[in-house]
Amino acid sequence: MLSIPVLRDGEERSSRDTHLLHGVDGVPVATVHEAPAMVTRLTVKRMRAAPRTAQDKRLAALADAGRLFAEATLGGQTPEEYCRVQSIVSGVPIGVARQTLGRMRDDCGLLGDVVARQSPVGAGRTARWVRRGSVFGVVAPSNHPATHGAWLQAVALGYRVAVRPGARDPVTPLRLVRALLQAGLEPGWISLLPGPHAAADALMDAADLSLVYGSEATVARLRGNDRVLVRGPGRSKILVDVPVDEAVLDHLIAEISADGGVRCTNTTAVFTSGDHRALAEALAGRLAALPGLPVTDARAVLPVRPRKEAEGLRAALHRAAQGAVDLTERYYEADGGPVTVVDEDAAALRPAVMCVDRSDHPGLGTELPFPCVWVAPWGRQEGIGPLDDSLALTLLTDDAALVDEALEAPGIRTVLHGRVPRWWRDPHLPHDGYLGQFLMEARGFAGS
């Protein structure tokens, strides 16, 4: 069985406080050592005293760490073994972890350019773009391994970073921290602090600034705290205001289901000026054909959870329905049901297509960790209103004025005009704004 250590000052440490990490099939995979709140606070204090490092040295270490993450054996774990374990504990198809290896390698090599583009054009002569603090805390998620690429930007900008890993995936940040240390990053600049909720709160309290991923309840609890950047549900949407052909359907299917539908940028609502029922039926037929397979199967495209948890997620969908019709259910009647047991007590979450008859149905704000999309009618007279509150909004339309309205709406964080394939892979594209906007500030400078 694996061991997930507390990692401080470049040393992997055990703890008296531990818990077992199980795979989605219920089999124990690792012992996770926990850093209690007091240790978390002490670690942050020690990190403040870590020696400064030059930016070019940090960027070189980051680039090398990306290569090591993708190619090296770290802590006795090969890249392929990492992918196998990551998929088993997170429930995300193994292909996602395999893609993340290459993505992390490529993105780490671009970090210098990525953070440079985030600085204001005026920074330089009469202004300086400087850090708001020195230690950055990260309360990480478990939905997708590539989310850890975000906090690497903080290292590039000169922050020491302490990561509290997500409960279902501590293996990705552990591999990344090991890669950073092997690449030569100063040991006091990076820590891995698995721990309970109290330790996460202690990290947010002790760090200068923090990035927290969480639910709507987490967003509400931390709203107004200018030291914490919260990334909650994405509620990403697509407007179809063009004739629907195979190319449009292909794009919709990819946006809904890519990476198992677990990303916050996966589409959860589709609005159309055309026949919404016909569009929903077409999506249901395509999505229902996606196979339920064990996550370690190379053909797997759907997430897997423990059976009871998967059933609970489907129950949550039914509670949100409020008259919406699930057009995929009939496809599953003779095919294992919408929650399909694939391995021991592990069950694949089959897609759902919910058809509603109005653009303000409350279910349209529902976001679940599998391919689940709500399809609704939309008319031009409704404007941006139903499309607002979106991490990403794709507009399949020739209406240039509507695109301008979307760009001006503060609740829409990314606007995509037309079928932009795999747009979420662009490391230069802001994700809910630039992280640098939160970590840095402009200060005036004048000298004789």
What are the roles of these predicted feature ranges?
Residues 206-207, 225-226, 267, 390-391, ...:
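Short, well-ordered alpha-helix to beta-strand connector turns
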Residues 182, 209, 219-350, 355-356:
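ALDH superfamily catalytic-core signature
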Residues 22-34, 53-70, 254-258, 272-273, ...:
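Conserved C-terminal structural/oligomerization subdomain of aldehyde/semialdehyde dehydrogenase
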Residues 61-72, 175, 179-184, 249-250, ...:
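Generic non-transmembrane alpha-helical segments
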Residues 113-254, 417, 428, 432, ...:
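Rossmann-like NAD(P) dinucleotide-binding subdomain of oxidoreductase/dehydrogenase enzymes
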